[in-house]
Amino acid sequence: MGGYILAIDQGTTSTRAIVFDGNQKIAGVGQKEFKQHFPKSGWVEHDPEEIWQTVVSTVKEAIEKSGITANDIAAIGITNQRETVVVWDRETGKPIHNAIVWQDRRTAAFCDKLKKKGLEKTFVKKTGLLLDPYFSGTKLNWLLSNVKGAQVRAAKGELCFGTIDTFLIWRLTGGECFCTDATNASRTLLYNIAENAWDDELTEVLRVPKEMLPEVKDCAADFGVTDPSLFGAAIPILGVAGDQQAATIGQACFKPGMLKSTYGTGCFALLNTGKDMVRSKNRLLTTIAYRLDGETTYALEGSIFVAGAAVQWLRDGLKVIKAAPDTGSLAESADPSQEVYLVPAFTGLGAPHWDPDARGAIFGMTRNTGPAEFARAALEAVCYQTRDLLEAMHKDWRRNGNDTVLRVDGGMVASDWTMQRLSDLLDAPVDRPVILETTALGVAWLAGSRAGVWPNQEAFAKSWARDRRFEPHMDEATRKVKLKGWRSAVKRTLIAA
């Protein structure tokens, strides 16, 4: 067995498999997109079987491109889109319904009903999360209530619930391991993050039988071995973390006060708060950053639902660009005298507003507004929303002032224009790492360190390397005008909702 580590990165729009060598360098990559299903307005689903097929095919592709065999892989790490819900038959392994995706808003009315009963404080206290359709618990309640016979079958122990990681572990191990990790469990509205256990009161409120819940393990732990018939070897699965927590690890944000922001379909900023569960007074989430050797490290998180998705909208909806990388150069050519604001509330607004009913809007258009101004507005919207998150975080986390350097990753950060504008609007330095695949790298480190073939935490943190630091160049007067315009646009969007 070699020192190679395989990272499975199961995302919202595609699945990636990445093989890292013993020096933490990428040896081979496989990637495959899958279909998004929109049965009704505000509903988003995935076919779990299609996701499973993309995992198998991308793993095989990555191994082949690496020029190795499955026997050379020391361990597998799995990272995944969080909150997305799958329920399957314990005997056959077949899903009873499409997966309900984290973006799905169908349970908004149910969340409001629970809030009116005064239950949000209970959920916040125990889970660190708000009562929002974003999280798994109300989606699971919907499945049990709307799929014929599901509630009764779940109570009999005939059904399994899991986030995507759990479903993949089950499939990869041939049903031998029914488990998840603490980071994914912490996103379900069912897990008590102080006690590190499924919560009896919350499962009762959401009518979720505990018989269908997986075992919760540390992020670096034994999650079984792959069925040899899949890839030609029984490979141990030794690391699991939700995508944003995996990125936090991949960015080596191990010390309290360190901060990262990932720009994929959405944008997610996490601030390491160490052993302290910092309770936000600014509508941020208190969540588990990682759990290693039985010790939990917590984080503050801000979630934005639309980041890269706004660029996809430019490409697929407005058709003003042919490919996502074109956005930065198009934005750069925009007329500086035009201040156009896009509030991309396509599926509601996330932190710190948490308004599922808000809808997207564009402000400031004139007869001369064109594709370049739309492109700039889409990219700037991501920057403005990041600033909103970081301002809320600094109010909750006052220990080190506001001099934090933001570490960034994800597909959007390859754009120099976007990162410079982010630094300008934050009025803070932004660090882009050499390795942009930080989500996969983070979970690869979990698996590799557990397998004993990758360095310990301290050495791994020292190996983090910066590609470029972006420093703010925008003058204060310009920044104030732009921020005032953004806040006005958001306010009008919320009023319209």
UniProtKB/Swiss-Prot annotation:
InterPro entries for this protein: ATPase_NBD, Carb_kinase_FGGY, Carb_kinase_FGGY_CS, FGGY_C, FGGY_N, Glycerol_kin
Question: What are this entry's molecular-function GO terms?
Answer: ATP binding; glycerol kinase activity
EC numbers on record = 2.7.1.30
Looking up CDD domains in the UniProt record yields: FGGY_EcGK_like
On the tree of life, the source organism's domain of life is: Bacteria
Kindly give the Gene3D superfamilies that the UniProt entry links to this protein.
3.30.420.40
Q: Does the keyword DNA damage apply?
A: no
Please list the residues that bind ATP: 12-14, 265, 308, 312, 411
GO BP terms: namely: glycerol catabolic process; glycerol metabolic process; glycerol-3-phosphate metabolic process
Q: How is its activity regulated?
A: Inhibited by fructose 1,6-bisphosphate (FBP).
Pfam families membership: FGGY_C (PF02782), FGGY_N (PF00370)
GO CC terms, sorted: cytosol
- For ADP, which residues are the binding ones? 12, 16, 265, 308, 411
UniProt binding sites for sn-glycerol 3-phosphate:
12, 82-83, 134, 243
Locate the residues binding glycerol: 82-83, 134, 243-244
Instruction: Please give the function described in this protein's UniProt entry.
Output: Key enzyme in the regulation of glycerol uptake and metabolism. Catalyzes the phosphorylation of glycerol to yield sn-glycerol 3-phosphate.
**Which family, according to UniProt?**
Belongs to the FGGY kinase family.
Protein name per Swiss-Prot or TrEMBL:
Glycerol kinase
- The scientific name of the source species is Rhizobium meliloti (strain 1021)
